[in-house]
């Protein structure tokens, strides 16, 4: 049996399964590419990279139903708590140990408002996570543009797998994501945050060819619902 199973749920949502189940950015019910319903997900932990609707997603509903631990930047955690669901805040540079899963919050270049009831609430700063789970290190970049300290993330945490956005417009596009792979130097990269909507339509095969022409990193392209086992 694999030590770790990583399933792409479309957009930036992933389910990581080892001794515990970690759900990242559960944008499910409004995601046209989602391979499941929120009711089918029973995580031990949810990690939220930022407050935008396509990342906060179904966090509150899943948290209320399962009682799982929810981790996010301080301001997003406060918003979740205002809805009657317990959440735990952290900030960039910090690490939390969740009894077998570690989350280290990293920089991301993006924004993080929370839009609800016709108003925008302060969502703090966007973030990524370096995740320690099942004996492996995984970097989920969140929504981000490229930044030079991705190299430092690679040097400090040596992630085996990087989950990187390639959709452009709101995040890195293919050109920038290829350079990010060069900076991070993971063994495997999985593209995400593309083709959910026409406005972020990209051909992941173009990304694969560009990466493989530059570095030895293996590109794994998943369809929503497909998994990697390590």
UniProtKB/Swiss-Prot annotation:
Keywords: Hydrolase
Entry-linked InterPro entries: Metallo-B-lactamas (IPR001279), RibonucZ/Hydroxyglut_hydro (IPR036866), UPF0173 (IPR022877), UPF0173_UPF0282_UlaG_hydrolase (IPR050114)
Gene3D superfamilies: Ribonuclease Z/Hydroxyacylglutathione hydrolase-like
Pfam families associated with the record: Lactamase_B_2
Record's keyword annotation contains Hydrolase: yes
GO molecular function annotations of the record: hydrolase activity
PANTHER family reported for this sequence: UPF0173 METAL-DEPENDENT HYDROLASE MJ1163 (PTHR43546:SF3), UPF0173 METAL-DEPENDENT HYDROLASE MJ1163-RELATED (PTHR43546)
Family (UniProt): Belongs to the UPF0173 family.
Protein name: UPF0173 metal-dependent hydrolase MA_1308
Annotated organism of origin: Methanosarcina acetivorans (strain ATCC 35395 / DSM 2834 / JCM 12185 / C2A)
């Amino acid at each position: 049996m694999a030590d770790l199973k990583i399933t792409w749920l479309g957009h930036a949502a992933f389910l990581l399964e080892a001794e515990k189940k970690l759900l990242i950015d559960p944008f499910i019910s409004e995601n046209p590419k989602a391979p499941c319903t929120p009711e089918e997900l029973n995580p031990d932990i949810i990690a939220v990279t930022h407050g935008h609707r396509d990342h906060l997603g179904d966090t509150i509903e899943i948290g209320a139903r399962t009682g799982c631990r929810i981790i996010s930047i301080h301001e997003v955690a406060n918003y979740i708590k205002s809805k009657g669901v317990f959440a735990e805040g952290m900030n960039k540079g910090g690490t939390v140990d969740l009894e077998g899963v570690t989350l280290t919050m990293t920089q991301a270049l993006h924004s993080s408002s929370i839009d609800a009831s016709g108003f925008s609430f302060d969502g703090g700063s966007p973030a990524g996570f370096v995740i320690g789970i099942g004996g492996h290190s995984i970097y989920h970049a969140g929504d981000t543009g490229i930044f030079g300290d991705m190299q430092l993330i690679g040097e400090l945490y040596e992630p085996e797998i990087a989950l990187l956005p390639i959709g452009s417009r709101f995040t890195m596009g293919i050109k920038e994501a290829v350079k990010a792979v060069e900076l991070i130097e993971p063994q495997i990269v999985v593209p995400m945050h593309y083709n959910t909507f026409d406005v972020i339509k990209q051909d992941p095969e173009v990304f694969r060819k560009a990466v493989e022409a530059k570095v030895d990193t293996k590109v794994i392209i998943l369809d929503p619902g497909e998994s990697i086992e390590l």
